[in-house]
């Protein structure tokens, strides 16, 4: 019986692959899309066939009820614990219950607020301490620059001293020791400048297939290109909207959280109150619409050096589709470009 069941299953797989091949051939002959788009759609179609997926299928509501109750029961059994991936920032995790699968999380701030440092800290915490696989797409910094930042941050080393070669022997030992730890962590870095959304999506799919994937981080969204590079300069808002929608769709397809860094418009600098608002998101209202969570980073000491709130960064949760909005505070160690729980510093 098992032998015949195996034959039936294999025939079904072959039929799925044949249908995928027919669809791909039709796309090539139609000529409606450019080559990168056809490659992206072809890869997705083959992966669907290989994993027995069919995106057009309806699901009986009874099945949805059962899976939803199972999810609620999992939360109940956690007794208030985290249901997502921990960032290791306690107050933030308590607010979000961790990074949730299929969520698109936007982290936005003006320059010099620590966006890259914040997400590098999250990447290290998730990969080293939670043992989860992280894909980091760095469009602004090279992989070596990014790794130097992570090494100094995790080893509590002054990044400026590392840049100018003034580390002591003891600091060198700490750097090497941390290098051994980070070198074993499941972090994968891609530093393709101006990467297209199709290419990013393809790389993320392959990484998930080959090594597993739990979290994607993109630094930063406005440096990405849409799928149609020929007309990318015509309407930047429409291009950002396409990228935003595609990232949300990718988060759902791979069932992983995606953290995308974003710039804020200069209008923040032109008003008396500098704290960011949702209307400050640069280039497209679709960013606010597509994101499940919007976080703003704000440091009062950046604008007011005399403030008593030195080294305090506010993480403002301005949108939270499935939870409360609030503000949590972290301690920012500038010399290490590292964030820590505020309670740890008190």
Task: Show which residues each predicted segment covers.
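Short, small/acidic-rich helices and loops at N termini and domain boundaries
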Residues: 1-78, 82, 113, 132, ...
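The Walker A/P-loop phosphate-binding site
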Residues: 56-157, 176-177, 184, 345-346
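Cytosolic-facing regulatory segments adjacent to core modules
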Residues: 125, 129-212, 226, 328-331
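A short beta-strand-to-loop transition that corresponds to the Sensor-1 phosphate-sensing loop
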Residues: 140-141, 260-265
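Flexible beta-alpha connector loops of hexameric P-loop NTPases
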Residues: 159-168, 188-194, 225-241, 268-279
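C-terminal regions of RecA-like/P-loop NTPase motor modules
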Residues: 198-213, 245-255, 266-346
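Helical hairpin unit composed of two closely spaced alpha helices linked by a short loop
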Residues: 213-260
């Amino acid at each position: 019986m098992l032998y015949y069941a195996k034959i039936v299953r294999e025939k079904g797989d072959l039929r799925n692959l044949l249908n995928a091949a027919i669809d791909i051939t039709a796309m090539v002959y139609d000529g409606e899309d450019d080559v990168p788009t056809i490659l992206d759609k072809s890869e997705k179609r083959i992966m669907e066939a290989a994993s027995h997926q069919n995106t057009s299928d309806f699901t009986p509501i009874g099945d949805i009820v059962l899976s939803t109750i199972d999810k609620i029961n999992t939360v109940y059994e956690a007794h208030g614990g985290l249901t997502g991936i921990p960032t290791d920032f306690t107050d933030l995790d308590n607010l979000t219950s961790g990074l949730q699968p299929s969520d698109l999380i936007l982290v936005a701030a003006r320059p010099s607020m620590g966006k890259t440092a914040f997400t590098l800290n999250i990447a290290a915490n998730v990969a080293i301490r939670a043992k989860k696989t992280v894909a980091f797409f760095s469009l602004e910094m090279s992989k070596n620059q990014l790794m130097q930042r992570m090494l100094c941050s995790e080893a509590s080393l002054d990044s400026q001293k590392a840049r100018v070669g003034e580390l002591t022997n003891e600091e060198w030992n700490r750097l090497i020791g941390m290098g051994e730890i980070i070198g074993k962590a499941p972090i994968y870095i891609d530093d393709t400048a101006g990467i297209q959304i199709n290419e990013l999506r393809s790389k993320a799919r392959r990484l998930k297939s080959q090594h597993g994937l739990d979290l994607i981080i993109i630094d930063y969204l406005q440096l990405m290109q849409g799928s149609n590079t020929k007309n990318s300069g015509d309407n930047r808002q429409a291009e950002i909207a396409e990228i935003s929608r595609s990232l949300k769709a990718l988060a759902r397809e791979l069932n992983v959280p995606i953290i995308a860094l974003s710039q804020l418009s200069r209008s923040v600098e032109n008003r008396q109150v500098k704290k960011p608002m949702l209307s400050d998101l640069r280039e497209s209202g679709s960013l606010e619409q597509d994101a499940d969570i919007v976080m703003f980073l704000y440091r009062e000491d950046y604008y007011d050096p005399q403030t008593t709130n030195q080294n305090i960064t506010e993480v403002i949760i301005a949108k939270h589709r499935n939870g409360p909005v609030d503000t949590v505070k972290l301690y920012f160690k500038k010399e290490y470009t590292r964030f820590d729980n505020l309670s740890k510093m008190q």
